[in-house]
């Protein structure tokens, strides 16, 4: 069993009735249980590790100098910054000079794709990506289309896997960037990045092109190998709060010699790749969390995989008609994504929330949208079913008891909702 993270479980949650969250017939669902919270939304964010917090505190109150200052306090901050960069470089198996700290995963994706596209615009105006990327990639590509770039969105199969041959086949003599995510943030499908990079390199060599390869690896940290040598990429994005680090800090690996126009202009920090005074406390916490996540990767993966497999096996037995989204095997160790046909996600999530269980319907970056998940529609789910997806993502601190309570509760919530007249009328 993986040791529990002391900040992972909220001590108590007020699950008393909220009139604004009631709907006819759910009175039994929303009764106050008085239980501790069960957090099952680790794909959205993770609790800050105690070790990371403790490492950060001195840089808020004592070593608060600007790392660009030449005085002693500034140089102490500079040493902390470069030490953190070394830690990250060891995990990524790259040079420290190739590590750039950003404000988060979204900024890292934007900097990689926009920066690479504009740097190579004279050579070509074509980008290749997939239909199931995070919005930080998709919306960036959509915007670049307004600047004269052409984008090919390669489809995926019913499990969310992209065919590496299809990615390579999409490359033309105008292609400048290929961006494929390492792990899908909604359904957990793991893409064959090494195979994709090999085929794209071969294709680029055959047509005499320089093509940059980027992967959004935000969901992979702590579960999969992040070696850029093994992955064969030119750029890789990470976000600290996905691996028990602080919010507001990202990482962008940029291979030496990669042409890139900076997204942010200013004082030329981060070797002129990302201007702006560095967030030293956040960066120190990020390096601490990433190092520990890598050291514990095997044990965390085993622990989470066992819990994940329990949930995947149990839910269809408890709730007939359940559909599993994502690849049954090639998926992240902590991810479960299911649909309950005939039910939308919101009432299920509210029912769980009012019992002290926190999950989500998909990407936390777009949960306010009424549109069905673009990922689920890309794998062939009809819009009405896609709107009913439930994403459960366990973590290093999740226990067997948490899973027991979740399974018991989700069965009760779904059963109660299916007994409502509105459900029976809708599904006649």
Language-model-detected regions and their locations in the chain:
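Pyridoxal 5′-phosphate
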Residues: 4-5, 10-14, 18-428
